[in-house]
Amino acid sequence: MKLSYVTDSLGHLPFEDMLNFAAKLGIDTLEMTTGGWSPAPHLNLDELLQSSEKRKEFSQALEKRNMTLCALNCSGNPLDPGELGKSHRDITDKTMELAGLLGVKKVIMMSGLPAGGPDDKVPNWITYTVSWPPVLKDILNYQWEDVAIPYWKKLVKKAEACGVGKIALENFSSQLVYNPETLFRLRNAVGPMVGLNLDPSHLLWMGADPIIAARELGSAIHHVHGKDVRIERYLSAVNGLLETKEVTDPANRAWNYVAVGCGQDLQWWKEFFSVVKMMGYEGEVSLEMEDLTMSPEAGIRTSVEALKQTISQ
């Protein structure tokens, strides 16, 4: 496996400065965002699609630093029932096209989350037993059978036509696919191009064990994010882990995304990566730095040091 980096946490730096910072840390593989939830600070999707000269300049900036692009990331909500969904679907289609033009074989996404019915206007995340109230069962059936699976069947065909080999869905909250079981429900319906972007931080705060999850996923692991989470023991013991406070208020949250090694110790990370590799994954581990208790640069350095000690080469 190889250390990569999601460049958004250095979004305050211009493209070339970001590349130089990453190169000094020994990172030579990048994952870059194209839009969706991200402002795409280092990549202009429409510009690169429309101009072969701009694509050449972009590629040369990477090549002169001996860097490669391992994946494009268009995470958003393509299943939103309103204008947001329309915009994110357009960005997704364009990302597939740009991946084809750049020779990038992997696209990182989120599954999306539909509304609860054809007349609803906002997404609806069902995470409680469908036994009560009974309408929850109808909502989930609508979301999966009427919205998600038909969309994803079309998107897989689009990706195939563009030369994309893998779509990796992040197991993120407020998405229809948020764990291995929901990933397999979609994968079984649309095919093996769709796999998981295994982000252990989300599984941990949801109460799962990412190491055991990796065993269950096997060849369905299409990508890995190196991101840690810390359960804040005092607040989580009082209120549990269901949390709606802003991420910008870490002192008052029950859990927080933190630099790698500031939540789980290095022995945990060694075992996690060892099992991921044992299950056949040989790809990139993209550092995603979202620790708001320190500067982006400090968090990246802390995480890179931890990941270099623990990734199974």
From Swiss-Prot:
InterPro entries recorded: IolE/XylAMocC-like, Xyl_isomerase-like_sf, Xyl_isomerase-like_TIM-brl
Domain of life per record: Bacteria
Identification of the protein by name: Uncharacterized protein YfiH
UniProt xrefs under PANTHER family: HYDROXYPYRUVATE ISOMERASE, XYLOSE ISOMERASE-LIKE TIM BARREL DOMAIN-CONTAINING PROTEIN
SUPFAM superfamilies noted in UniProt: Xylose isomerase-like
Species this chain originates from: Bacillus subtilis (strain 168)
